[in-house]
């Protein structure tokens, strides 16, 4: 990584579920706090699995967060004394999130976003691909495939223990009872006629 001499840039943390995205976001935020920098964390209101007002990793690490309904609501909470803006579960935000992140970085903030880069079908998820394209730094994390133990880059949605069909709804917030990390070879997405 290169030394950045100017303020304002974008970092994307992405990967499958259970790859440590929220944990990495929390780690980066805590490091900034140790350095006496002011950070604020946002999350979409839809993410209420573990807490309404915290970003919580699957292993229980947490940091206070401001839940917002729309991307542009983030601006209402930004003050000039802040250094770092962190956004978890970025794939759940509306299409304005790309512009919001660009504006914040252009204003001199370090912007850290974390989210799924692929949906349960293995296709690009929401605005994450665009954010990856404009980011100065991209960290792609992998989990361990729950079926074979290989590196997992995909998220398997399970309904009653069976892989969800391709045309099932994209957004369904859940935890380990609904999703598993899978490698390319163990990931399965049948069509409804295959079920």
Curated annotation (Swiss-Prot):
One GO CC annotation, please?
Answer: cytosol
Question: Mind telling me which InterPro entries this protein's record contains?
Answer: P-loop_NTPase (IPR027417), Thymidine_kinase (IPR001267), Thymidine_kinase_CS (IPR020633)
Source organism, top-level taxon: Bacteria
Q: Does the keyword Electron transport apply?
A: no
Signal peptide residues on this chain, from the entry's feature table: none
Q: What is its main location?
A: cytoplasm
TM helices/strands, residue ranges:
none
Tell me the GO molecular function terms: ATP binding; thymidine kinase activity; zinc ion binding
Q: Share an example GO biological-process annotation for this protein.
A: thymidine metabolic process
Task: Please tell me where Zn(2+) binds in this chain.
Answer: 145, 148, 183, 186
- Catalytic center residues: 89 (proton acceptor)
Among SUPFAM superfamilies, the record links this protein to: Glucocorticoid receptor-like (DNA-binding domain) (SSF57716), P-loop containing nucleoside triphosphate hydrolases (SSF52540)
Q: Which HAMAP family match?
A: Thymidine_kinase
NCBIfam families of this UniProt entry? PRK04296.1-1
Protein name as it appears in the record = Thymidine kinase
């Amino acid at each position: 990584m290169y030394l950045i001499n100017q303020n304002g840039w974008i970092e994307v943390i992405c990967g499958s579920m259970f790859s440590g995205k929220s944990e990495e976001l929390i780690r980066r935020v805590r490091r900034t706090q140790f350095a006496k920098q002011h950070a604020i964390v946002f999350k979409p209101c839809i993410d209420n699995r573990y807490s309404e007002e915290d970003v919580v990793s699957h292993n229980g690490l947490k940091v206070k967060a401001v839940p917002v309904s729309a991307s542009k609501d983030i601006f209402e909470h930004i003050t000039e004394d802040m250094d770092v803006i962190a956004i978890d579960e970025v794939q759940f935000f509306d299409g304005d999130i790309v512009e919001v992140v660009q504006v914040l970085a252009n204003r001199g903030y370090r912007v850290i976003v974390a989210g799924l880069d692929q949906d349960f079908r293995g296709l690009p998820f929401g605005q994450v691909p665009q954010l990856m394209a404009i980011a100065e730094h991209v960290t792609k994390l992998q989990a361990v495939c729950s079926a074979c133990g290989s590196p997992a880059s995909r998220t398997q949605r399970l309904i009653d223990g069976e892989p969800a069909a391709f045309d099932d709804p994209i957004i369904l917030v859940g935890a380990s009872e609904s999703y598993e990390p899978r490698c390319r070879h163990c990931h399965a997405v049948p069509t409804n006629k295959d079920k």
